[in-house]
Amino acid sequence: MPTILVILMLGTGMPALGVEGIPTSQIFWAVVSLVLVYTAYVSEVYRAGIESVHPSQDAAARSLGLTHVQSLRFVVIPQAVRRVIPPLLNDFIGLQKDTALVSVLGVVEVLRQTQINEAAAFNGTYYLVAATLFVAITIPLARLTDWLVARDRKRRQAAGVAT
């Protein structure tokens, strides 16, 4: 389900129910929406990481007398975690970009504040500042991801492990 649809459904639908005890804060529902959407993304990344570990790794651990849980804990999961770090950082970059979507609820975040300032001053440089802020966060994260991938590739080649 698209992120904006989840934000709209929860951000407008939940407060409209009028049920006592349910928060009506738009910021609360914006955060809940982003958490729900990105939890689904992250769980898929981890699932793919676990499935990417060759079944022979589990079989070798089981042949050494490890239980299924021990095999997962000591053999499969550590290998999977190494493989999922770059995709997780990509998801984090996507999350940082998707925060601008919460403005549809009226929550004032960076892009919405930029629109307010630009409308008041008729000065387009506010958009330049907002873009610079997004770029200043995104580019270092992208470089970190590239560095981690290159480091992992180098370690695998040094160990003679096929990628």
Named regions from a protein language model:
Residues 1-163:
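Transmembrane alpha-helices and adjacent helix-loop boundaries
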